Amino acid sequence: MTDSQDKVNGGSKNTFLSRVFGVHSSAVENSLDAAEMSHITMPTEQDFSNYAEDEGNVRLIESDQEPSSSNEDSNDEEPLIQQPQSIRFDTASDGMATIQSESEPDEGGTEEDEVHLEEEDFSDQDLASSVSKYGQPSSSEDEEPLSNRDSNRGSDETIPFIGRQRLNLGGKNPITGATKSTKNPSESRVFERLLGNSPAKMFRNNGRPNNLEESFLFRKPSVAEQSGPGKSTHFNLKPPPIFNNISTLTSTSKNSLSSLSPKERALWKWANIENLDTFLQQVYEYYLGNGFYCIITEKVIHLATILFVVFISTYMGHCIDYSRLSSSHTFEEIHIEQCYKTQISPTAKVFLWIFYAFIGLKVLQLYFDVKALKDIRNFYNYLLSISDKDLQTIPWQSVIQQLVLLKDQNAITANATEVKAKNRLSAHDVANRIMRKENFVIALYDNNILDLSLPVPLLRTCALTKTLEWNINLCILGFAFNEKGYLKQAFLRESQREYLGEELKKRFVLAGFLNIILSPFLVTYFVLLNFFRYFNEYKTSPGSIGSRQYTPIAEWKFREYNELYHIFQKRMRLSMIIADNYVNQFPNTLLSLTLSFIQFVSGSFVAILGILTIFDPDNFLNFEITPDRTVLFYMTVFGTLWAVCHSSINDEYTVLKPEETLEELVSYTHYAPKEWKGKYHTEDIKNEFCRLYNLRITLLLRELVSIIITPFILWFSLPKNSERIIDFFRECTVYEEGLGYVCKYAMFEATKIDKGTKAKKQTKRMFSQAEQDDSETESDEGVNKMLQSYMYFVDDYKNAGNAVGKNQLPASPIEPSYHPYSSTKDYSWKTQFALGKNSNRKRNLNRSRVKRFPDRSSDLELGSLSGSLINKSTLFKDDIADNADELKAGNGVMGLLNQYYKKSDRNR
């Protein structure tokens, strides 16, 4: 084992494991040299035999199935969902990033034609200039002699540099999916129209150093870890250690974990992951929660908040004698002794005991959460070399880098069986696993699948609220995904469409009845919670009643595919400054006049009552103007009303430049419908934006009303969309090797948008020509959203200015911009979400510019498989043997109540 480590660390041998996991070099301290960790690669034709199919011709998730036998490897049936080509994002030395693609070579191709499939041997000196390897062989038998590869490299050097195929994120053009040889002028014109006739500006580094291009996504250490002026904060993270006893630990039984040290236990957990999605979600939630003690404190405070609201409301409602309040002078005079026995009714006692049982279950759940959090803490501390105190400032990119390094460094200790486990670990794959469900939700709202209106004249357009959103996620996602977090196979079968639609309708109706039963308690809790939370804020600063925030539907519209929550949340918070500036530029004279009159009247009453109080301050304050309403009460009411009106009147002079301000705002929200083009200065666009960026007090009232009307939406509106929702999952699902079934838009491959599943083509035949045109328009919108998400995803992980903590902003100075629409305010955080340094340069990414792309079904190309340290024998098997049992699981009353309990403290 020591010899093998020396060979790998020395970087002098290109062994089998180095071909699978990348060459390790001591000069870069075993940095990210594994191609499978940094981009989506392509397999050889031998990998086609690894596809698994069930009896219904539906492919199993590779990470969830048993090792296939030699007989099963010969199965060459076509899968349900075909594999399209992947994206390649190249970066040249001049700072210009290009998009390239590769076609699968023909069997009769020459060696020169297939040179791009060969692996390149490289070192640290020529890493930046050499062509990276495209794929990883699946076994040592595929290893090619070094002499042959030298000849291949020589033939490659004869090709002009500008014509070479260069490696980056994927392999296929995300716009057309075409190879370089099939590119034609019409496709170039489509690409130019998409990027506003200036594609170079979309991908240019705008003067950044050339070494900035070599991020950890592209096989070199992240720039965030390089010191120097103008670069991000330097984090002295130690590379994950190499463990020599991993083979012994992997054979340790689960019952013997108590005898292991925390470090060995963390390594055993890592090597025996049963569900990679759940594990990565726990790692990310631990990062969001800022460590062990912060997460535990947050959970305890959440339980304490619920207890306080219930206790104080029960006590104030049953243990205080309000009839003696005016004539009493001490608390003992109004307090009712033994109020629990004498004042609380038996029905109320039953509900209190149910509440106490709920709290007891939450405390028990907290106990198990503590045990799970300890394992994640050990994983961070011992395997990733990241302490809890660093989580508040360390960027997520560094966590990803440590994850990749952990797998890369300890791969030398894994045996041949373990490295065949098809679990890729890169920034794109990690984001897809963490957001497997969220990506479907983004597409669900972006494609306007749900009908939230009611057949009532005044409630035909019902806005999405947190309560309704929570119920929708519970009904749809809880039904579409199994307990392991994977999409149920029945959703991919056209024959199950009617059955699934009926089951989903029943689920909506059942959820509506549960909301009716719980609505009295939810309304009471919601009113009390928000009263305690916002009363003091509105009392001390009445002007905050006019504050705004984004609506729930706006958040889903603005969020990009594979955009993690902390990145999205920071983007939304930073955009609020510009959003307020945009809204305040539109004066409302009618409202100002009305508020001025109300301010005058309320101020007059306060002045009159105040003057009268001077003559008899002891008695006049308790003088009742109306029954049980004293002077002090009315002075408080009129004073608050005056303060609210005064703060709502905007009498400041502002610079009227709505076009420039909204352009700047769009650079953060990433949302600009084609209907807005050329109308940024109009009142209609401002009102439409205000529906997305509404008053907070309005949203609170909507949430209160939503608790009452949500059951009716679940009964009458959403059941009509059941079959459409089933079609959505079937059409928006693709199979990705090593990941399983994911949302097609999250893979950043335009070929998957057009192809989808076989069921999508069968469904299209049932619609008229006009409906097909509408479908094509929606597909174009989906392609635009996908392309936009791809660009910002690359920028989030490749731009050094974005490698900051969750609550930090880049400290690098802003270079002056000469864009005619640049803002007059020099925000120090503009580079946080900019493509390159020039943050004020607006991206002319209009989502209406992409036209329908030609179908290229013959250009399909598969991504390569990569090895893993994870034991394949411990990966669970997807239990799809009985489709009926899988669909019926959790659909009854108790199953839905169980999901209500599990998700009761999320998004509510």
From Swiss-Prot:
Cytoplasmic compartment spans: 1-299, 371-507, 529-594, 651-696, 718-908
The protein's name: Autophagy-related protein 9
Keywords: Autophagy, Cytoplasmic vesicle, Endoplasmic reticulum, Golgi apparatus, Lipid transport, Membrane, Phosphoprotein, Transmembrane, Transmembrane helix, Transport
GO cellular component: a single term: Golgi membrane
Basic and acidic residues bias: start-end ranges: 146-156
Membrane topology: Multi-pass membrane protein
Binding partners and assembly: Homotrimer; forms a homotrimer with a central pore that forms a path between the two membrane leaflets.
Organism from which the protein derives: Kluyveromyces lactis (strain ATCC 8585 / CBS 2359 / DSM 70799 / NBRC 1267 / NRRL Y-1140 / WM37) (Yeast)
Record InterPro entries: Autophagy-rel_prot_9
Intramembrane segments: 508-528, 697-717
Role of this protein: Phospholipid scramblase involved in autophagy and cytoplasm to vacuole transport (Cvt) vesicle formation. Cycles between the preautophagosomal structure/phagophore assembly site (PAS) and the cytoplasmic vesicle pool and supplies membrane for the growing autophagosome. Lipid scramblase activity plays a key role in preautophagosomal structure/phagophore assembly by distributing the phospholipids that arrive through ATG2 from the cytoplasmic to the luminal leaflet of the bilayer, thereby driving autophagosomal membrane expansion. Required for mitophagy.
